Structures are given as C-alpha cells and as structure tokens.
Amino acid sequence: MTKLQKALFIFLNSLIILFVLILLSISIPKFEIARVIANLYTPDGQFESFTLIYAKLRYWLIFIGLMLLLTGTLALIFHKRSTSFFLHTLSKIQDAFKQLWLDAAVFLKALKNQFDLKSGLMVLGITLIGFGIRIVLSGKPIQYDEAYTFLSFASRPLNKALSDYHLPNNHLLHTLFVHLSTRLLGEGVLAIRLPALLAGGLLIPAAYLLGSKLYNKFTGYLSAMLVAVTPILVDYSINARGYTLVALFTLLTWCLGIYVTRHANSFAWVLIGLVGACGFYTVPVFLYPFGILFTWLLLNLLFKQFSQSYSSQINFFMKMFVAGTLTVILTAIAYLPVILSSGTASLFGNVFVQSLSWSDFIQTVPHRLNDTWQEWTGNVSLIFIIPILVGLAISIILHRRISSLKIPFQLASVLFLIPVLLIQRPNPWAKVWLAFLPIILVWAAAGLVGLLDQMKLSRKSIKVITAGICLVLLIAGLRHTVTLHRQYAQPGTVEQIVLDLAGELQAGDVVISMDPVDIPLQYYWRVNQLDPAILNSDNELIDRAFVVVHLPFEQTLEGVLTDQGIAIDNPQFLQEAELVEDYGSSLLYVINAD
C-alpha cells in the first residue's frame, strides 16, 4: 500500500467520523439546543422545517450516526485489514466503471446501427409529422387537472413543489420539467404542456425501436405512424400531465430489456435502473409496465433465453438484481422530500390508491374497462379499429412465426397484472393504462405486417402495402387535426369569460365559480395579470358578484353560490340576478349586492 493510498483511507474515515459527529450533535441534545446547532450549518442561519425533520429523523440519525462511528473507529483501529479490504473494493469499483464505459460505447454504437440513413429519415419524417400535429393542437383550452398541476405545484418554489403530495395529481418529475419550462418560456399553455408534448412526440421513434426490435422495420414504421396519429395519444401529448412520460419510459425500458437479453451490457442494465426510477418518480403506476418487464426478464432467466455472453444464470440474475435495486434506491431518494414533508401515508394511504372492497372492485372493473375503451377509440372510425384488433389477435396467434422473442411480453403481462390487480384491487382509471396503448399498437402493427408475410408476398409488396397503410393513417390524422384546430383556434369558454370580465371589473367586484371551472379560471386570471382578490368569495366588501354556472355539470346559480358558502336567505335575491352572457356550455350572471 502506497503512502497516498494510506493517506486517502485515513482521510475518508476521518470524514465519516466528522459527519457522524455533526449528526450526533444535532440528534442527541434537546430540541432547542439541536435547533441552534443545526442553524450553524446553514448559510443564512435558519434551518427551515427543522421541527418536522427533527421529530421524524432524530432516532434514525442517532442510530445511523452510532453505526457509522463504530465502523469508522474499527476501521482506524484495524487499519491493515480494513485498508486491504478498502483497496480491493476500490479496485473492483474501478474495474466496474471501466467496463461500464466500454459497454456504453458498445451500446451507443448498437443504437446508432438501428438507424441507417434510409430508416433514420423515415422515422424522422414520421416523428416530425407527429410533433407537427401536436404543436398545431397545443392551443387547446387548459383543462382542470393541468391547471391544478401548474397552480398548486409547478408554479411554486421547487422545495415546495417536489415535497407536496397532498394529491397524487402531483406527477413529480413532470412537475419538475413544467417548473423549468415555465421559468424559461413563461406561463403560457404551450410552456406548461411542453414536457408532455416532447414525451408524446418521442413516443414515435420509441415505438419504432420497440417494433423493429421485437419484429422488423416494417412493423417499426407502421407502429411509429400509428402512435403519431392516434387521437388519444395526441390528446395526452397536449395535456400537461405525466402520462406520456410514463408511456415513454415504458417503451424505453422494454427496449432495454430486450437488448440486455441479447447482450451482457452493464451500461444497458444501469439505464434500466435509471429510466425505471424516472418512471416511478413520474407516477407510481409505472409499477405495472416495469413489473411486466421484470416478470419477462425472470421468465427469460428461468428458461435460459439470454445471450451466451452471460457466464451463467447467476450472472444474469445478479445484473437483473442490481438494476432492480438501483431503481428502488433512486426512487426512494427521489421521494424522500415527500416522505419527510407528508409522510408515507400520502404515497400509500391516500384515498386514490386505497384498495377497493371486493364487491366494489368487481363492480368497478367493467366500468373502467369500458371507460378505457371509449377513451382509446373516441374519434376513431371502425375502419381503423377493426384492423387494429385483427392485427393484435394475429400477433398473439402467430407470435412464434413473426417475433424475434421466444417468450412473449403478452404472457408476462398476464402473469404479472392478474395477481397484482387482485391483491391491490385499485380503481383502474383509464389514464392508468395509457402507457400500454403504444405497445398494443406495436403488437397490432406486427400482426398486420405478419399477415402480409404469411401470405408469401414479396418484400417489395410488403413495403408498398405498409407505405400505403401509413399514407391512409396520415391522411386520417391530418383531417382529424384540421377539425380540432378549428375548435381550438378561438379562446375556450373559460378564457373568453376572463377576457370579457377583464374590461368590466371594478372595485368591490367578486367572481364566483366552482369545479370544474374554478381552477382553469384561476389560471387564465393569473396569465392575464388580474387581481386574485376578486376571486375570493369570502370578501366582506362585495358590491357586485359575477357568477359562472357550468351547464354540462348541471350546475345552477343557487348551487354555485351555496357551494361557495354564500347562503340564500331571500329567494328574491336570485330573481334579481341578471344574465350577462350565454357561452353555450356556461352562463355568466351578475348580482348587485344592494
């Protein structure tokens, strides 16, 4: 052992002991003393939220501190053995990083080879079409959930935005991206929707990758075009929520999973862990696609369906275990601010994730499946639905003939989802399953291309027919885009109400509304820089009240006022309300206080 190595070892142990002493200095004294000490370690002398953190972590810090102190002390006492162990471990880590670097180069080269000039241009063209459709429609009026995401989370300082989980509406990684995009580009709807839009557009080349890896390039092209123009995928891409991110991470992890069964590449395994953590940090429902992936990997392990470049089944299992562990550790670290601020109950015990009773679960599932079907097939003609269903069925029936995999992902999906859903008994909202739609479209594309192949058509004929199908899909997608663009070209109802009120408001006015109008109204109020106090119905000095009544939710003037805590003692009061404007879906009334 060189002097430099010995000095490094002693230095690291000294740092451990110093860190331990700081922990113990905060944890062991009484609260007031601990708070004063903690303030010494902050730049401004004020440790925010120290009371909450101290109460939750004190005994854990004491335990961790004592264990580290014991470890560091023993390492210094038995320095020869511990130094030898340290150097051996350091050498292993260095070797692992060298191999990781080499594997990264191999992986990137393999990724580059997925796109020759011709296929690269094809995928780029389809991707640009998909992005174009999404950008054209990005002016859609802001919806309740995305307005709530921005106002309640993304517009706040990051330390608040990424620790507040009072509703699972906070898709944390998406919130982080929206926070950054709105800081850079302003608070317009396009800036708010940019992360979802980018993820939705990147689904297109990701679908090509999965289709080409599972089947062939023709399947990849058709998959990409289906993802580019499918209405519900376009709609989620212009909805500032985290679901397109989850879908993107799903496709990426599945592509990586296929790759690692064919190549013993440590870098790809690490990417599975990193991308997996990103998926969980976006929305915890990423458990479903990620669980299916690891079920499929486990099946490949059991039936030895992996590359001979792995030295053994144990070698494959250890890499799989490391990737899974990396995902768990990174996810736990990412959610630590939430746990410290809101506790684990906000993640696992909120009303939206609690298990249903068996009777409620059995009654709910058929309705949710119908909701999912209606959402996925809305604005889609039967002319397209039937071929997709036929293609999906063929991909399952002809799996062994058309797929490059011996173990189908469909089997892993059944083996994982059925027991998990029966144990968990969730309320399976349609949006939970969006990540699977691009995969289903890949399977459908594979079935259609596989059918052409089974008909013994030439490669040129398959190419022409596939191109023809893509052209038909493109025309249908563009027609649908033109129709929607005409609707979105004008301000939506809520935005128009705000614009109309902006020139009418005066001192003593108040604007009253309720769900689902109130949150979008607050957003447009904010971007138009109007006085937020006017939206406060608790204001005692009210001269005039504007009331928004949303007809699709069967709201009434009296119902809106009552919901906002305004008692109606005199029926004559409602009769004196004057209808200012009929917006079709909403009515705007004005009531004078006198």
Label every model-predicted segment:
Residues 6-111, 119-456, 461-591:
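Membrane-proximal helix-loop-helix interfaces that form the catalytic/acceptor-binding platform
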